């Protein structure tokens, strides 16, 4: 299982702002979700996929 954490660029680096709702079975599913988010997102967010144990 994977989760997608969302960060925003800050003057001191990256600031954690939250997590995309849901858990994903595969890394590829998580990547697709990120690509869909980027289509409508107007802010400069950065996404990180993390495996949940």
Go through the PLM ranges and name each one.
Residues 15-28, 50:
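A short, exposed loop/beta-hairpin motif centered on an aromatic-Gly-Thr core
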């Amino acid at each position: 299982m994977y989760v997608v954490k969302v960060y925003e660029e800050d003057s001191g680096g990256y600031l954690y702002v939250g997590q995309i709702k849901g858990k994903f079975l595969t890394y590829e599913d998580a990547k697709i979700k990120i690509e869909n988010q980027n289509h409508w997102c107007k802010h400069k967010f950065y996404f990180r996929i993390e495996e949940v144990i």
